[in-house]
Amino acid sequence: MSQIRLTFLKEKNKMKAIKKEFNKKAALLEEKVVKINRITKVVKGGARFRFSALVVVGDKKGQIGFATAKAKEIVEAIKKALEKAKKQLVRIPIVGTTIPHDTIGRFGASKFFLKPASKGTGIVAGGKAARTILELVGINDVLTKTFGSRTSINVIRAVMDGLQSLRTKEEVAKLRGINLAKKEQ
């Protein structure tokens, strides 16, 4: 076989291995549909309907992703949103069953306040969107408050902003150049 053909086959095998690994990770994810919206476009001949799906995926161990997608059928929209969400996974630091510290997430007119809670408190969150994202990321004890816009997508983006701003004690110490081992002795 020619050298080009061998190189092509090696690349193809690498891609198969990457896809296999991606599918293993995707199998561990839990998925929830937060909202389905009917979209109408009025044209000369009448109204054209499509559907928009807002989906959240997570492994309940600190990985979370969300996405929206549109399609002519509900099932297609959900499927497209799931694929997009799985590609946009983000790692969130969790301490035990709660978050490391207070934080505020902002997106547009939405503000979302997150505060750590003691074990057994549960998720104190108003609205399906915020509760869903916190459950799927694996946070079981947290106090929250939503301010401003309560639209599902805005709340989810505000929650994600807040969660992505979280840092563990070790990460903060490393950023500040402090050695925690010396401090604790």
From Swiss-Prot:
GO biological process: translation
Pfam assignment, any one: Ribosomal_S5_C
Gene Ontology terms: cellular component: small ribosomal subunit
Keyword Nucleus set for record: no
Keyword field: Ribonucleoprotein, Ribosomal protein, RNA-binding, rRNA-binding
SUPFAM superfamilies: dsRNA-binding domain-like (SSF54768), Ribosomal protein S5 domain 2-like (SSF54211)
Gene3D superfamilies named among the record's database cross-references: 3.30.160.20, 3.30.230.10
Top-level taxon in the UniProt lineage: Bacteria
InterPro entries: Ribosomal_Su5_D2-typ_SF, Ribosomal_uS5, Ribosomal_uS5_bac-type, Ribosomal_uS5_C, Ribosomal_uS5_N, Ribosomal_uS5_N_CS, Ribsml_uS5_D2-typ_fold_subgr
S5 DRBM domain boundaries: 29-92
A GO term, aspect molecular function: rRNA binding
Domain notes: The N-terminal domain interacts with the head of the 30S subunit; the C-terminal domain interacts with the body and contacts protein S4. The interaction surface between S4 and S5 is involved in control of translational fidelity.
Family membership: Belongs to the universal ribosomal protein uS5 family.
Function: With S4 and S12 plays an important role in translational accuracy. Located at the back of the 30S subunit body where it stabilizes the conformation of the head with respect to the body.
Assembly information from the UniProt record: Part of the 30S ribosomal subunit. Contacts proteins S4 and S8.
The protein, known as: Small ribosomal subunit protein uS5
UniProt organism field: Aster yellows witches'-broom phytoplasma (strain AYWB)
